[in-house]
Regions:
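Periplasmic c-type cytochrome electron-transfer domains
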Residues: 19-341
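Bacterial Sec-dependent N-terminal signal peptides
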Residues: 1-24
Length: 341
């Protein structure tokens, strides 16, 4: 009888903990949708997506004619370039690590400091940034208008516009394509949808630690992050290599003292393949990144074993990347600017 009572108590204990974890999971996380979300002020159409795809891969949006969106946000790998900071115009290096474009449509805003409200606003930045594509709206529009096929594609994608091939419509088309770059059906998504067998015991232990330690307080929602802004170094600031003192994050946008060293929480979907980590791009090991966040944000000394379990869970956030065929780009004409290297 004592044995039976003991086994029943053990069963009840584990059942209670499973129910408790399930309740916490539903509070923190949402499965990634498999369909394109509704985009504010930019109804998505097949014509816009097709045009946006061409623009995304076309290096002629840059002043040099050799840098495309895909250069720094490579869809063949992880939607970024796996470099500490991106290499742009004239081999110049940017100041921050390039975030992945996959699932970026679900972020509260774009860029580490949230200076772009949405993807169409974000697309304007790199095109005009001196160390990235080094171009300007007038040059980009002139370049694309030199190719009749682009003119026709814009007229089909924006039939309501009197001047279809405009800089605003260029960025709207890019946004339409980027909104399709979703990576659903990760192991964790399946778990969120009710498949208890999709995660191993160690992955579940890692998830439990992720919640218990407080990681999920900043990294939750659809994108497991990307929903709000937080100071980097709540408890203890990391070293200058990881948190450069001259990069004050969101302060550069708001000029509000309380926003110094505040950054958008990094979305963790596909984090296992998006190294290096942090806005400085100086940490290559995911376990090390977990330990740094434990010290800096939570005041927690995360052990090697705990970091291993948490990273085991983080690997379950890798979803199915879309299969994307390279587009055939419009042919250059005699008035199309030549590449400048």
């Amino acid at each position: 009888m004592k044995t039976i009572l003991f086994l029943m108590s053990v069963l009840l204990f584990f059942s209670f903990n499973i129910l408790k974890l399930s309740a916490q999971i539903n509070d923190y996380f949402t499965p990634l949708p498999k369909s394109i979300p509704v985009i504010k002020n930019n109804p998505i159409t097949p014509q816009k997506i097709d045009l946006g795809k061409k623009l995304y891969f076309d290096p002629r949006l840059s002043a040099s004619g050799v840098i495309s969106c895909n250069t720094c946000h490579n869809l063949s790998v992880s939607g970024d370039d796996n470099l500490p900071t991106s290499v742009g115009h004239g081999w110049a290096k940017g100041d921050r690590n390039a975030p992945t474009v996959y699932n970026a449509v679900f972020n509260v805003a774009q860029f580490w400091d949230g200076r772009a409200e949405d993807l169409k606003e974000q697309a304007k930045g790199p095109i005009q940034e001196a160390v990235e594509m080094h171009s300007n709206p007038a040059l980009v529009v002139k370049t694309l208008k030199s190719m009749p096929e682009y003119v026709s594609l814009f007229e089909k994608a924006f039939p309501e516009s009197t001047d279809a091939l405009s800089f605003n419509n260029i960025t709207k088309a890019i946004e339409a394509f980027e909104a399709t770059l979703l990576t659903p059906s990760s192991k964790f998504d399946k778990y969120l949808e009710g498949d208890e067998t999709s995660l191993t015991e160690n992955e579940k232990k890692g998830l439990d630690l992720f919640i218990e330690k407080g990681c999920a307080d900043c990294h939750g929602g659809i994108n497991i992050g990307g929903e709000d802004y937080y100071p980097f170094g709540v408890v203890e600031k990391p070293g200058a290599e990881i948190l450069p003192p001259d990069d004050k994050g969101r302060f550069s946008v708001t000029q509000t003292a309380s926003d110094e060293y505040v950054f958008r929480a990094s979305p963790l979907r596909n984090v296992a393949i998006t190294a290096p980590y942090f806005h400085s791009g100086q940490v290559w090991d995911l376990g090390q990144a977990v330990m740094i966040m434990g010290n800096s944000q939570l005041g927690e000394e995360i052990s090697n074993n705990e970091a291993l379990l948490i990273t085991t869970f983080l690997h379950t956030l890798s979803g199915e990347r879309p299969k994307i065929a390279l587009p055939i780009l419009p042919t250059r004409e005699k008035d199309t600017p030549k590449p400048q290297i």
